[in-house]
Regions:
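Basic- and aromatic-enriched surface patches that contact anionic nucleotides/nucleic acids
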Residues: 2-17, 40-195
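C-terminal active-site-capping segments
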Residues: 14-27
Length: 195
């Protein structure tokens, strides 16, 4: 099967519908049908500067980089590229952080609608798992660079990697609690998993 790619406009209102970030069960959005952090994705690594740049782009009505989603066999979606931007947008709309000292819930109705009606350009990709993983590796050469372990996790995903990430790739993971004084690097960039 050759990967099929279709361009679709999705509003931030649609994207943030049923957004949920659950440390153990993952991150979902888009009516609960989008897996924002599939097994091959890294943890959220954007800092304040990057998050604010995303919100500034949306607020100004400038075009945001294209995102890539993949369809699953059950009709739901998973993010191939755009996880960091998606989480930044969802966190802002859910008032989890302020942009220019204003939380989303403090904006006027018109300001909220302008953001919620903003259209994101999303390529929906349909193909085999190996095609999707290859596409993930190909399109992730820009942006915040992936570390070698993050790329390995994209190529070698599965239940073992998912379990290992739970224990070694979160700031609240058991490995961090036990080894923080002895290990260098960042658990969310998967340095502990690589060790």
């Amino acid at each position: 099967m050759t990967m099929q790619i279709e361009l679709k406009e999705i509003s931030i209102r649609e994207l943030t519908d049923r957004y949920q970030d659950n440390a153990e069960n993952g991150v979902t959005a888009y009516h609960g049908e989008l897996d924002v952090r599939p097994p091959y994705q890294r943890e959220f690594v954007y800092g304040e500067k990057e998050r604010n740049a995303v919100i500034h782009t949306v607020e100004q009505g400038f075009p945001l980089n294209v995102m890539y989603w993949a369809t699953r066999d059950n009709g739901t979606f998973e993010i191939i590229d755009g996880q960091q931007r998606t989480i930044s947008i969802c966190q802002y709309v859910k008032s989890e952080f302020a942009y220019e000292m204003r939380y989303f819930h403090n904006l006027s109705g018109d300001e909220k609608d302008k953001i919620l009606d903003y259209k994101l350009m999303v390529y929906i990709c349909t193909g085999t798992d190996s095609e999707k993983l290859k596409w993930f590796e190909t399109i992730n050469i820009a942006g915040k660079p992936l570390f070698k372990q993050e790329l390995r996790n994209a190529v070698y995903s599965g239940s073992w990697v998912s379990d290992a990430k739970r224990y070694f790739s979160k700031s609240s993971c058991p490995a961090y609690a036990i080894g923080a004084d002895y290990l260098t690097g960042s658990p969310i960039r998967q340095d502990y998993l690589e060790t």
